Amino acid sequence: MIRRTLFAAALLTVATLSAQQVQTQPTKPTLRELTLENIFDPKAKVTFTGTPQSGFIWLDDHTYTWPRTDAEGKIVEQTVLDTATGKTRPLFDGAKLQAAIAKVPGISADEAKSMSLQRSWNFSPNRRSILLTLSNDIFVYDFDSGALNRLTSAPGDEEEATFSPDGRSVAFVRGNNLYTVDVATQRERQLTTDGGENTLNGILDWVYQEEIYGRGTFRSYWWSPDSARLAFLQLDERPVHRFTIPDHIPYRQNVEEELYPKAGDPNPIVKLFTVVASGGTPREISNEQYSGADFLIVNVDWTPDNKVIYQLTNREQTWLDLNVAEAKANATPKTLFRESTKAWVETQGNPVWLKDGSFLWLSERSGFKHLYQYKSDGTLIRQVTNGPWEVRTLHGIDPANEWIYFSGTERSVTGGDVYRVKLDGSGLKRLSDRAGSHSANFNPAFSQFIDFWSDVETPPQVSLLRNDGTQVKVIDANESPTLRQYRLVKPEFVQVKARDGFTMEAMLIKPPDFDPSKKYPVYEFTYSGPHAQQVRNAWSGRSYLWYQLLANRGIIVWVCDNRSASGKGAESAWAAYKNFGTTELRDLEDGLKWLESQGYVDSSRTMLDGWSYGGFMTSYALTHSTMWAAGISGGTVSDWRDYDTIYTERVMLMPQNNPDGYKNSSPRFAAKNLHGNLLLLHGAIDDNVHLQNMVQFAYELQKAGKQFRMMIYPKSRHGVGDPALVAHMRGLMLSFIDENLLGRGRSPATAQPSE
C-alpha cells in the first residue's frame, strides 16, 4: 500500500513536471509558404536575398571604398573604411557633388540626386576624381576642390571615356573616332578621322563584345603604361550582313538594324593600330603573316616596357598566337608562342607581369585551365599549377614573397575557393574556409582581401581576410531574416554516373514531407552549354526560390550538369565539338534515368526547362528523345546557322566545313519528331538569339502537324526583364507545369532513351 502510494505520487510529480515543460517550451513558429507573387510580382515581391554590400574598390593597401546601402538596398553614400583603425568616412561630399551636377544645363534636380549616388564610378588612377557624362558631354569632378569641370562641349555622344594612367588625359570615342582631351587645359585632339557607320575605331560591334571581350564591354582602346600612346582596334563592318529587329509596340513601329554575322557569313575585318596620345598618324601593326586568312584579335594589352602584346586566333579558333610588337611605324610583330588543343582555344586573359620581366599565363592546353610561367621571349619556364581541377581567376602575385593568388576548384567543382601558391608551384594553400563559393578582391600589396561568400541556402556575405586566410572582420553578415520565415527544403548534392562512367554533378530538391514510397513528378532545369555550370553551391536568388516553390507543390526539382557544362575542365567541354546536343542529351538522359531508378519518380510526369542554350537543349531533347513528357524552351536556337559566327564556329566550325553537324544539331530539322507538350518563349526584340529562331521552328512544327504553345514578350531581348512581363511569364510557366506535372501523365511505356 505504501509502495503504491509512493509510486502514484512519483507518477503525479513526473506528469506535473512534464506538463510544466510543455507549457514553458517555446512555440515553434509557423513557416510561411512561398507564392509566385512573393518571388516575381513587382507589387508583392519579397526581398529574400537581403541587401549585400558590393562594389568594393581598394584605394590603397589599408583603405577601401564602396557604395554603402541601407536595409532597403538604397545607396546612402560612397563610404571609405580604414582597415587599420576601423574608422569610416565619406569618400566625397555627396551634397556638393549633387549641387554641382544640378548646375549643368539640362539636368533636373532628381537626375542630379540619382547621379550623385551611383553604384560604380569612373575613377582617376589616384581615386581623387571621377569622370561623369552629363548632357552628352564629359565632366571631371575633383573630390578635394569640389569643382566640376567640363572637358568636352561638342555635339554627339561621347562613349567609353577613361583616364590615362598618369591621370592627365582622358580618351573617349565620338562618332566612332578616337579622341583625347587634356584634363588641365581641356584641349581636345582627334586621333582618327575615318570612323563612321561602317568603320569603328576604339569601340566594338555586337559580336566582338558579346563573344570575345565580354557582354557589355564595348571599349577597344588601351593606354600604354607611360600614357604616351594608345592601341586600338579598327573594325571594318562593310562585309557584315545587317539584321532587322522590329519593335511592334510603337504606333509607327520601330525597326532596329543590327550588324550581325551569322555562322558562315563574313566577319568584320579587324586591324590593330597604335597612335600617339597627343595626336599624329595612327600606325597599323602589320599582320601580313596571316595574309589571306580570316582572323580575330581577341585580346590587347601593353608590356611594362610599352610594347603592344596581343592575342590573335584563326576564324574557327583552333589556335591562338601571342604576339608582341613595338609601337612604331611598320613594326613587325613577333609570335611568342602558339596555343592549340584537340578542339578549340579560348582566350584566358592577358599576361600578368613579374618584376624580372617574365609573365604568368593561363592555358587550357592540358584539358584543365592552369598557370604557366614564361620568359618575356616566350620561353616556357614552368607549369605552376596542375591537376584535375581549374584555376578560374588569377588575382595577381605578391612579388616580395613570390606568392600567386587565385580562385579555383581544387576543393570542389560545385563551389569555388581562394588559394595561394609559390611561383615554383610549391606550398598550395586554400585560404577560404567555409564550403560554398568564394571570390576575392585583393589590396594592391596582396596583404589582405575582401572575401565574398555564399552557398546554395545562404545569400552573399562579405568578410575581410588576411593573405593567410585568417579573418580580420565581418564586413556584411547580410543575415536575411526574411528567408528564415519561409518553408524551404535543403537541397541535396549528388553524383551520377553517365553511361561511359563520367561522373556528373547534380542537385536534388525533394518536396517537404517527402515519402520515398510515393511517386513524384520531376521538373528538370538545364543550360547544358560549354563551361556553363548550373549545379553550384552558391546563392542563385530567384532561381533557387522558384525551385523551392515547385518543391512545395509536390514536385521533385532536378538539375544535372552534363559533362560539357560540368566545369570539369576544357577536356569535358570538348565533348560538344562539332556536334551540339548529342553528348549533352545522352548525359541528361542518364541523369534522369538515375533519378528514376531511386524508386520515387513518376516517369510519365517529367519536364525539361531551359533558356538560351538551355532552350535549345529543351527543343533538341523533345525532338530527339522520349524521356520527357513536356518542355519549356526559352530563347531557343532552332538552327545553328542563325547564330553568330564567333560562338558557333568555335565549337561547330563553319557550316561549310561541317554541314552534317549543323543539320543534326538543329531542332527545326527534327520538328516532325516532337514528343511531349512544348511551350516556346521568346523576346520579341532579342538581339542575341533572334525571334527568327522560334518562328522557323514553329513553322516546321506546324507543317509537321505538331501542336505546341508559344508566347512572345514584346520589348524583351535575350531574357525578359520588365517586372510585369516576368511575372506574366512565370505565371504562364507555372500553369504549364501544373497542367503537365500535377495533372494526368502519359504512359511510361513511351519513355525510352535515345540510342
Q: What label would you give each PLM region?
A:
Residues 14-16:
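N-terminal signal peptide c-region/cleavage motif recognized by signal peptidases
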Residues 241-245, 297-301, 306, 437-755:
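Serine-hydrolase catalytic core recognition
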Residues 8-9, 18-460, 464-465, 481-483, ...:
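Beta-propeller folds
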Residues 7, 23-24, 685, 721:
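Intrinsic structural disorder/low-complexity segments
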Residues 1-7:
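Bacterial N-terminal signal peptides that target proteins for export
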